[in-house]
């Protein structure tokens, strides 16, 4: 009897633990799916092939395949360190010099909206955080519609950002997989049918994931139909300067819409064009009817931000602000960002040239027609799978590659592999 009682006492904690697990507050929580891009990176890391290529990651690499910190960023960091600045909280709306410089960069120094002060810009946590602030603002104050129309396809994070803010997602045609180019006719048809006073999201430049941008004449037609339908245009500008190498050219569409009197909101990121990926520097801007309205909007944006994260991070904003507001650093940045854009453009040209040398009979012109970091190659999922298994070349299943991950030393290998799986 004593032995039995002893065993019962010993087993009691185990039964209690099992019961606790079964009745856990979180027992209903299912394992979520892995991030598709991070999954590509993990598989790449496990590969032992010396020729392996990771074309999934959305970060710039130099021609040696190494991560790159801009010289102007290094100089700005040194200047900040020398000043021995404090680590106090930033204001809720962010670093004032940074937000003003961000607005000037996006809108242009001669912009009527900028010069008249009929805008408000708040600092956000890079592009994602700025988009989320914007989404929450629209959810609370845009009373006309809950619908946000995204191009098909769009950046994968757009859907959860707007959905989790309580908005509803719709789509308009954008990319034609048959031609690997813009479905302009489809886009115009769909946008012309969007209910009035809805929200339409537009990629200002270097559309992610396709790399397909409208031409300026097409942007004019798009602006015309957006204005006719009385839509609110939400511009996502994550690549200003990084697309064409020209900050003004990359902001042309945004500025044209504003000049046409279209209501616009904007999210910016400095992850790509300044290489400040981990610093999380970004901004959200609302173009208003006058300066008084801008003050009211700013007051509500600060009320929204306060329970989200209270104050934005300091370091990235200081770096970006110093670069944008210091003539010598700004000049150096413009040269460096053009250098990054030019290298990507060169890799596109070299890839097509090497495909021709391989004897490929396919038309690869879309690779050079597209712009920015990403390229929709037109490769099918089974071809992508072969590239991974046979050549250790990693990319997302939709055939999107980060051209920034291609270098002079391996562009020939990539072309050879693509030819082998497409011939």
Swiss-Prot record:
Keyword Hydrolase recorded: no
GO CC term (a single one): mitochondrion
Expression across tissues: Detected in heart (at protein level).
Superkingdom per UniProt: Eukaryota
Residues that hold substrate according to the record: 58, 155, 208, 400
Family membership noted in the UniProt record: Belongs to the class-I pyridoxal-phosphate-dependent aminotransferase family.
UniProt transit peptide range: 1-22
Compartments it resides in: Mitochondrion matrix
Species in which this protein is naturally found: Gallus gallus
InterPro entries: Aminotransferase_I/II_large, Asp_trans, NHTrfase_class1_PyrdxlP-BS, PyrdxlP-dep_Trfase, PyrdxlP-dep_Trfase_major, PyrdxlP-dep_Trfase_small
Protein name per its UniProtKB record: Aspartate aminotransferase, mitochondrial
UniProt xrefs under CDD domains: AAT_like (cd00609)
Membrane-crossing segments per the record: none
Summary of the function given for this chain in its UniProt record: Catalyzes the irreversible transamination of the L-tryptophan metabolite L-kynurenine to form kynurenic acid (KA). As a member of the malate-aspartate shuttle, it has a key role in the intracellular NAD(H) redox balance. Is important for metabolite exchange between mitochondria and cytosol, and for amino acid metabolism.
A Pfam family matched in the record: Aminotran_1_2
Enzyme class: transferase
Miscellaneous comment as given in the Swiss-Prot or TrEMBL entry: In eukaryotes there are cytoplasmic, mitochondrial and chloroplastic isozymes.
Subunit (UniProt): Homodimer.
EC numbers for this chain: 2.6.1.1, 2.6.1.7
């Amino acid at each position: 009897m004593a032995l039995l009682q002893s065993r019962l006492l010993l087993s009691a904690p185990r039964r209690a633990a099992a019961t606790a697990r079964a009745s856990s507050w979180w027992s209903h929580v299912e394992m979520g799916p892995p991030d598709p891009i991070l999954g590509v990176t993990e598989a790449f890391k496990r590969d032992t092939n010396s020729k392996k290529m990771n074309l999934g990651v959305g970060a710039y690499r130099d021609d040696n395949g190494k991560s790159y910190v801009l010289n102007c960023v290094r100089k700005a960091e040194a200047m900040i360190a020398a000043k021995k600045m404090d680590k106090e909280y930033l204001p809720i709306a962010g670093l004032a010099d940074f937000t003003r410089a961000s607005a000037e960069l996006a809108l242009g120094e001669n912009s009527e909206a900028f010069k008249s002060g009929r805008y408000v810009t708040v600092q956000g946590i890079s592009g994602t955080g700025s988009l989320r602030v914007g989404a929450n603002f629209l959810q609370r104050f845009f009373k006309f519609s809950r619908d946000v129309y995204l191009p098909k396809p769009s950046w994968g994070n757009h859907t959860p950002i707007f959905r989790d803010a309580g908005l509803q997602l719709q789509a308009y045609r954008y990319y034609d997989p048959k031609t690997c180019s813009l479905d302009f006719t489809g886009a115009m048809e769909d946008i012309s049918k969007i209910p009035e006073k809805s929200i339409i999201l537009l990629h200002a430049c270097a559309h992610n994931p396709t790399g397909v941008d409208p031409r300026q004449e097409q942007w004019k037609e798009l602006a015309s139909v957006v204005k006719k339908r009385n839509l609110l245009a939400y511009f996502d500008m994550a690549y200003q300067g990084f697309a064409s190498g020209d900050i003004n050219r990359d902001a042309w569409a945004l500025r044209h819409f504003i000049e046409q009197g279209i209501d616009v909101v904007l999210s910016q990121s400095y992850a790509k064009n300044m290489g400040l990926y981990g610093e999380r520097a970004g901004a959200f801007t609302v173009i208003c009817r006058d300066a008084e309205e801008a003050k009211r909007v700013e007051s509500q944006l600060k009320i929204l931000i306060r329970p989200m994260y209270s104050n934005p991070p300091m370091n990235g904003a200081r770096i970006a602000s110093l670069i944008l507001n210091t003539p010598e650093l700004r000049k150096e940045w413009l040269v460096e960002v053009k250098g990054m854009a030019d290298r990507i453009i060169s890799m596109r040209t070299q890839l097509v040239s090497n495909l021709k040398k391989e004897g490929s009979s396919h038309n690869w012109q879309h690779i050079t027609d597209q712009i920015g970091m990403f390229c929709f190659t037109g490769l099918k999922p089974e071809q992508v799978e072969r590239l991974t298994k046979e050549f250790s070349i990693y990319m997302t299943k939709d055939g999107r590659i980060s051209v920034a991950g291609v270098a002079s030393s391996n562009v020939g290998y990539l072309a050879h592999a693509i030819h082998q799986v497409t011939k």
